């Protein structure tokens, strides 16, 4: 592709690679005249600015010269480290002179720009080259076999490489070797090339073509291989490029014959040895691979010959060519588009002439109209293979399982010599392990699980614990695997039996030292109201109780006693006891604060009296431990857990461990843990983990630990998984609970842990820790990837089912001809990943389908089955009679029941619509969700199941199986149904069609009151309801009825059958075509299975009222403006009719979005995302818009966006494709 051009008949030279910016020097060419026949000569320097889109190059300086040039080169001699304009321009003149110029002075505008000049040569100097190893050495060639080596440090006295070759001849080209600094080659028009060794000052080899027709016009050394070079021939009889290897100089190594006429110049890229430029008399510039002879690129040039061609040293993709038409052109081999250049030429022409007639009439002309080039785009393709400088020498990529895949291109020396190198491609796959401690601890956990050595594992963790809390956690976990776990829990809480016995014994010794003795029962009853004997007995134990009983009852074993029946309290109690009235006696004792007597009498009075007495006692007693005693006696442990101060959580947990029954133990521990977790104190929140360990609640332990600990590091996750695995094993062994059920949070943590293990290369361990009985899609996909990465099924693990179904979609083809026998399709299962809901009824799952494939036929919901037969079972449907459309109520049509397969054609004269995919059923998993409840169910609740991905959705059609879903409105149908876009968003139901599907007839599923003059339909008397009809009926059916104007935003496109067959809609039976608009279909309500007549009685319906739409709020009006403008731009750029149909349908279906904006029913998140999409459209960043679209769909409610987001994606995709 052409980048720049300079109108000069001149020789050219690029600035050295170290120089920035890039300059191009031009010197007036000798023996050539421009169009002005000027004899003046000049030396100019131009700057290459690729950021400027114009073709003109900026001229930096011009120096008027008295010389015209045969050769011009720019050497890097005296180039400073900063890359400033320096070096030296070396020019070969007409009269054997070599002139050295200072380019920095030329650009600065100085007059004294000549560094040195020498006229030692005889005749014009046509060959010049700079040694790339010693930049002060310059080789030159002229007539009479003159070759000089110039030292720029001592320019006055050149040296020769050796004796002149005989016979004397002109030196047409000269070149230094690119690998060996003392090797020089020269060539002459006779076809002979001589290789010189400057150390020996003699030629070492001569290369010549045996045909003697090789007129050498170009010479170039291989950039990498020191012994290879190419020679170009300008003879039209032999327009070839010969590649020679000096080790086999008897014949050319390879001959390139891509030019039709003689070659004038060649240039070998220093950046890529596989790119060789050549230009010839056939007006072609070719870029070839000299190793294979293949033409990789042909530059788009004009019909003029090019006599010089050069690569840019700094930018390897840029080259320049000087042609005989007086122009130097700059090209890029990376391709591009020339549309901009053509438009610039048109603009230049238009700006020159203006709006006046260029032929002198003086009349103004209309603006210049450029014909639209719709089919042809001037795209210039790049090279067939990537050049070396953009090919990566090395590369790396991580793959699943922690594997690192690297490649490198290694050059190895060949067997023929050390200089010859061959490129080898190596690919290495290595395992990358970054978390060694994480893997080590994971292995220890696996060994503990496999060996069942949980106690030893927990003890190691206790010994290695660095915090007291960590030590307590592992101690609690260890107790689960020991005997008497509750007693061990109490010891961990600080309640050891031995220590408690010592404390009690010490307390008893203090009591004995004070000589406090209990002498009789009255003293016991009246000793202390607060600290009752019952509480003391509870604390001192059975041994003290027995001693008390002996001390109380032994003194009263003999003698007589008085039974007093006086009027005091004792007398009343005596009378109540003598009459057996225990309840009154207890009440008297409680009244007299004789608590012990009351409780002892209540025991004699029965359990009910004892319970009431205990409650009254606890109500009167107000000691510090009364509530604890109450809970112990009444066995109300929930009261302790719910009401205790959380600072005493250890005491509450100890009480639960001591007294709670096994069936309520876990719930009480959970309750206490929940209280601790909800407390604001972080220390108490962490202690909740101990309660959950006692309860064996793994899910809550995960939640609490995640909240309390930092989980960003892999080792933090390892800490949690260790505790979870050990606790699950403990619960499984001790509590006989089902641990296979995994909660959502635990499944997420286990999945994250398995991902980390897989990333470190532990595939088997990742599979072992991954939950088995969960239906979460991400876990199912991870298990599938792990099994595939392992390469073989794991022992004890069933190979997981692929969480998606592979389908081979047949290419679209025309449907069968009408009248051909078609077997009905059998329902096929569609698999949805576990945990995901199927698409709602009628939603189109867009896929990569053939646009020519016909729409898919829906299956009647009344005939759905949850069991699918393994083989197709033909059950042809009898064709149903066509039915009319109208407004009001549900459709009167009911699907026909399947009948036995007939012996004749099941579809007489009925065309069948084929589909790109055979979806007619649904998965057993979701079949029950879509079964129709009764034949009278409304269309809004009786949609067919969703088609599989890649299938279209066709409503109705000739020969389609009956369906109770909504039907497309055929042309010419009468009625006053309001447009779908005029209805509020909340009233629109029904399936969302594909872009090329007939729109569904939206109905509100309401039962309307039947009119009084309604006539029931005639029962069905024939299995086929007028399939053909009489001629009069057909003539009436073809007459269109008076159409009722609908909203322009809800026009119904006419569908087409495959193969270009038009779809004429569903024809109406006789007598229904010319029906006035006031008539509509009645809603027939009846018992399931009631017969339906073959004629339909129409009754007058209520007149419909047109709904006036609200205006779109001002803050959202930009959305409609932006989306409609984008669709119009796409329509103007689209050339494919199918694409235009997509965009037309998208424009209509975006009305759903505008209605929701009018009603303001969209959530703020969705509206904000839509505004972001609109901003990306304004900046034409459609990729960002598609990313935002995916984010909105994945994070929002599906019911809010299903009506318009799919078509918005279609518009963005088409805009990105069309580049509007």
Swiss-Prot record:
Q: Using the record for this protein, list the coiled-coil segments as residue ranges, or answer none.
A: none
Q: Where are the transmembrane segments?
A: none
Supply the alphabetized keyword list: Chromosomal rearrangement, Cytoplasm, Cytoplasmic vesicle, Endoplasmic reticulum, ER-Golgi transport, Isopeptide bond, Membrane, Phosphoprotein, Protein transport, Proto-oncogene, Repeat, Transport, Ubl conjugation, WD repeat
Q: Where is the composition biased (Pro residues)?
A: 869-882
Q: Where is this region: Interaction with SEC13?
A: 161-471
Q: Which GO terms describe its molecular function?
A: calcium-dependent protein binding; structural molecule activity
Query: Which parts of this chain are annotated as the region Disordered?
Result: 791-908, 924-1096
Modification Phosphothreonine, positions: 1161
Q: Which domain of life is it from?
A: Eukaryota
> What compartments host this protein?
Cytoplasm; Cytoplasmic vesicle, COPII-coated vesicle membrane; Endoplasmic reticulum membrane; Cytoplasm, Cytosol
Q: How is it modified after translation?
A: Monoubiquitinated by the BCR(KLHL12) E3 ubiquitin ligase complex, leading to regulate the size of COPII coats.
Name the disease: Halperin-Birk syndrome: An autosomal recessive, congenital neurodevelopmental disorder characterized by intrauterine growth retardation, microcephaly, marked developmental delay, spastic quadriplegia with profound contractures, pseudobulbar palsy with recurrent aspirations, epilepsy, dysmorphism, neurosensory deafness, optic nerve atrophy with no eye fixation, and death in early childhood. Brain imaging shows semilobar holoprosencephaly and agenesis of corpus callosum. A chromosomal aberration involving SEC31A is associated with inflammatory myofibroblastic tumors (IMTs). Translocation t(2;4)(p23;q21) with ALK.
Q: What is this protein called?
A: Protein transport protein Sec31A
Q: What's the gene?
A: SEC31A
